[in-house]
């Protein structure tokens, strides 16, 4: 029974997070991307902390939690999501989800550089290189391309994936006392105000034009992909571990592509499919030993 629950939760998380990429594009019609990210994490932070309180968890950060909250709030919430929302506003949901699927690959590269326990191996190096190749395939249009992706958007998403991976590796060096939900809530409430500052510095209008589509998309980003998605992620992380959870990145593009096609009329190019397959091969090379252990277990 638990195995089926985990499978359902995994697919639900992939669907929720995959659909968030076209939702970002839909919401940009009413609010600029950095302000959108700021408002989203203001709301999610409050919801997640309320969840932690309702579960009887401590939400008061101690000295051991401060650095972890800052690393996550600045690196993951502010930098990663700021770049993600700006980049995603320039490309299709399918392309955005595929570029973000490189996060586990870059995590291994940064771990090899900054963590003593993570030694580079030929297969890991090859996997990281394939991740780069897959991203280039996405960004460079083929000879038959009609509607080439915006290379600036792909570049921003690529940098967003790298920022997430670097911050995640930094968090592995920390030993916080707070539970995952409370810690994530504080990260969001640190990153949200930073995104507001970035929005002001970028000269974005501090206003929201609400239409039915914008309201649905933003509500989805906050409550479905945000609150429900993160809580699903917390539970699955405890039960499945980081290796299997990383596979969500490789299922999410399926849902991102379908929702983008159905809701926004987005077209999937051959480059997107080829780039995704190359990135998948890179992931298998990087995570070969961990995947073998997970299957054997």
Where are these predicted regions, by residue range?
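Glycine-/small-residue-enriched transmembrane alpha-helix faces in small-molecule transporters
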Residues: 1-38, 44, 127, 146-173, ...
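Specific transmembrane alpha-helical segments of multi-pass solute transporters/efflux pumps
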Residues: 15-16, 20-21, 47-100, 106, ...
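Membrane-interface helix-cap regions at the ends of transmembrane helices
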Residues: 19, 23-26, 30, 44-62, ...
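Transmembrane alpha-helices of multi-pass small-molecule transport proteins
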Residues: 30-79, 104-111, 162-167, 184-203, ...
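Specific alpha-helical transmembrane segments that line the substrate/conduction pathway
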Residues: 35-45, 76, 84-118, 124, ...
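Helix-helix packing/entry segments at the starts of transmembrane helices
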Residues: 39, 96-102, 169-193, 222-262
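Transmembrane alpha-helical segments that form core, pore/gating elements
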Residues: 48, 107-109, 115, 128-131, ...
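Hydrophobic transmembrane alpha-helices of multi-pass small-molecule transport proteins
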Residues: 70, 102, 110, 120-142, ...
């Amino acid at each position: 029974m638990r195995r089926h629950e985990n499978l359902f939760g995994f697919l639900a998380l992939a669907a929720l997070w995959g659909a968030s990429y076209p939702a970002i594009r839909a919401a940009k019609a009413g609010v600029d991307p950095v302000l959108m990210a700021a408002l989203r994490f203001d709301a999610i932070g409050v919801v997640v902390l309320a969840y932690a309180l309702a579960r009887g968890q401590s939400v008061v950060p101690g000295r051991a939690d401060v650095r972890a909250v800052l690393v996550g709030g600045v690196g993951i919430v502010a930098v990663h999501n700021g770049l993600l929302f700006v980049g995603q506003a320039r490309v299709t949901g399918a392309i955005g989800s595929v570029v973000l699927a490189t996060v586990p690959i870059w995590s291994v590269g940064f771990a090899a550089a900054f963590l003593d326990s993570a030694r580079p191996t030929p297969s890991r190096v090859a996997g990281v290189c394939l991740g780069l190749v897959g991203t280039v395939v996405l960004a460079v249009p083929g000879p038959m391309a009609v509607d080439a992706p915006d290379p600036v958007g792909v570049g921003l998403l690529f940098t967003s994936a790298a920022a997430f991976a670097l911050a995640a590796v930094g968090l592995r060096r920390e030993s916080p006392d707070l539970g995952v939900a409370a810690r994530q809530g504080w990260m969001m409430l640190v990153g949200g105000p930073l995104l507001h500052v970035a929005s002001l510095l970028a000269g974005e209008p501090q206003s929201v034009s609400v239409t039915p589509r914008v309201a649905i998309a933003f509500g989805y980003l906050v409550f479905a992909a945000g609150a429900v998605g993160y809580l699903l992620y917390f539970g699955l992380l405890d039960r499945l571990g980081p290796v299997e959870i990383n596979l969500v990145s490789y299922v999410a593009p399926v849902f991102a592509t379908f929702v983008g096609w159905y809701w926004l009329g987005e077209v999937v190019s051959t480059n997107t499919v080829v780039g995704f397959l190359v990135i998948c091969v890179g992931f298998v090379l990087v995570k070969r030993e961990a995947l073998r252990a997970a299957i054997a277990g």
